[in-house]
A protein has these predicted regions:
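A conserved beta-strand-loop-helix scaffold within acyl/acetyltransferase catalytic domains
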Residues: 3-53, 57-69, 123-148, 153-268
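Aromatic (often tryptophan-rich) hydrophobic motifs at membrane interfaces
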Residues: 49, 99-103, 224, 230-338
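Short, solvent-exposed turn/loop segments enriched in Gly/Ser/Thr/Pro and often Arg
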Residues: 63, 120-125, 329-335
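Conserved acetyl-CoA binding element of GNAT-fold acetyltransferases
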Residues: 70-89, 255-267, 297
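A gly/proline- and charged-residue-enriched helix-loop-helix capping module
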Residues: 76-128
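Soluble or luminal CAZymes and related metallo-dependent hydrolases
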Residues: 93-101, 169, 214-218, 274, ...
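C-terminal "cap" of GNAT-fold acetyltransferases
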Residues: 153-157, 333-342
Length: 342
C-alpha cells in the first residue's frame, strides 16, 4: 500500500470513500476539514490516504493548527478521528495498514512541529454503534488513555418510549410546555436557512457568552456547514415573541446527528424547561426525518479537570435517556515541555 497526500487525491474520491465506509462519519469528510480550518490559526491539512492498485484502502484526516500559540494536531480543539479503513481488508492487512498509517502520522506531526495529537474513535461510526469496538485501539499505538463515555439517543424508538426514558423532571417540563404552548421551535436546514436567521443565532451565542466568540471565517464556515446539508440550526422563542431565547447547532451525516453547540440568552438561563424543550423538538425533528441516532453529548467525569460549566453541561446531556457508549480517546506528545504549557 502506498501513501497518497490529500492534495494529490481530491475531495470527490475521498468523500465517496467516506460515504461507503462503516468506519467514517462527518468528521472524516472534506466538508468537516473545510469547517475545521475556520477554528484555528496557521492551518495545515496533513491528511492522506492509503492506495493499492488505484483503490483507496484507508483515509486519514489530520490537521495541524496553532492554538494558544502552540502547534497541535487538532481541529479547533476537537480530537482527530481515528483512521477509516476499507471493510474488506483482512486482519493481517489491517495491522499492516495501521502500522503504516500511525508511522506516517507521527512523521507528519513532527515535520510540522506539532507538540501533540489527540485522537478518538467517533461514536457515530457503525462499529461503535453496533458495539463492535470493545477496547481502545489507540493504546497499542503509544497513546495515553483519556477515554470517557457519551450519550447517544436511539431515535428508532417510538416517541412515548423516548419520553419515558428521560429524567422525570425533563419529561414534566416538556409535557407542560406542550400543553400550554409556551414555546415555538423552528428548525432550519440547507433549504430553509438564511443569513439573517443564522446571524440571529450568532448574536444569541455571543450574548450568552458575554463576548464575541466566533471569528468571521468560523461564522461563515458554520453557515456553510448547514448549506452543505451537514447541519441544522434549531431556534426557540416564547410563543408570541419575535426574539429567540435559545438555539443550538446539530451536525448531520449518514442519518446520524451530533449536538454541536447550544446557547441560551442569559436572562432565561434559569428557565430549565427551555433546554429540555429544545432538545426534545430536535429529537422529534430528527426522528421524523429518518435519523436513527442522536449523540447528545459527551459525559465528562465530575472532577476538577473540567470546569463547573463543562460538568454542568455534561450532566444536563445525561438526562435525555441516551444509551451510554464508549468514547475511546487518546493523546500522544511529541514535545513534552511545550505540551505542558497548553
Amino acid at each position: 500500500m502506498d501513501i497518497l497526500p490529500f492534495a494529490d487525491m481530491g475531495a470527490t474520491a475521498w468523500d465517496a470513500f467516506c460515504d461507503e465506509s462503516r468506519e467514517a462519519w462527518l468528521r472524516h469528510t472534506t466538508t468537516f476539514m473545510t469547517f475545521g480550518e475556520t477554528m484555528g490559526e496557521e492551518n495545515h491539512n496533513l491528511s492522506f490516504s492509503l492506495m493499492e492498485g488505484g483503490t483507496i484502502r484507508a483515509v486519514v484526516p489530520i490537521m495541524v493548527q496553532t492554538q494558544g500559540g502552540v502547534r497541535v494536531c487538532s481541529v479547533g480543539g476537537h480530537p482527530t478521528p481515528y483512521p477509516a479503513l476499507a471493510e474488506d481488508l483482512t486482519p493481517h492487512e489491517r495491522v499492516t495498514a495501521l502500522d503504516l498509517i500511525f508511522g506516517e502520522i507521527d512523521r507528519r506531526a513532527r515535520e510540522h512541529h506539532s507538540t501533540s495529537i489527540r485522537m478518538f474513535v467517533d461514536p457515530l461510526t457503525e462499529p461503535v454503534v453496533q458495539n463492535e469496538v470493545l477496547v481502545n485501539p489507540l493504546l497499542e499505538r503509544g497513546y495515553r488513555d483519556t477515554s470517557i463515555h457519551t450519550s447517544c439517543v436511539d431515535l428508532t424508538q417510538i416517541e412515548e418510549t423516548l419520553l419515558q426514558k428521560m429524567a422525570s423532571r425533563r419529561r414534566r417540563y416538556i409535557i407542560a410546555a406542550e400543553r400550554t404552548g409556551t414555546y415555538s421551535v423552528e428548525v432550519f436546514d440547507a433549504h430553509t436557512i438564511t443569513k439573517e436567521v443564522f446571524d440571529a443565532y450568532v448574536e444569541l451565542y455571543s450574548n450568552a457568552a458575554g463576548r464575541v466568540v466566533w471569528s468571521e471565517p468560523h461564522t461563515q464556515g458554520t453557515l456553510n456547514l448547514i448549506r452543505a446539508g451537514a447541519g441544522l440550526l434549531v431556534l426557540l422563542r416564547a410563543s408570541g415573541e419575535s426574539g429567540y431565547r435559545a438555539g443550538h447547532m446539530v451536525m448531520l451525516y449518514k442519518q446520524r446527528a451530533y449536538d454541536l453547540s447550544s446557547a441560551i440568552v442569559p436572562a432565561y438561563r434559569h428557565d430549565h424547561d427551555i433546554g429540555a424543550v429544545m432538545q426534545w423538538e430536535s429529537m422529534r425533528y430528527l426522528k421524523h426525518s429518518g435519523y436513527s441516532h442522536y449523540e447528545i453529548g459527551w459525559l465528562l467525569p465530575q472532577t476538577e479537570e473540567y470546569s463547573h460549566k463543562e460538568r454542568s453541561i455534561s450532566h444536563f446531556k445525561s438526562l435525555f435517556g441516551g444509551e451510554v457508549l464508549p468514547l475511546f480517546r487518546g493523546e500522544k506528545y511529541y514535545n513534552i515541555e511545550e505540551s505542558l504549557i497548553v
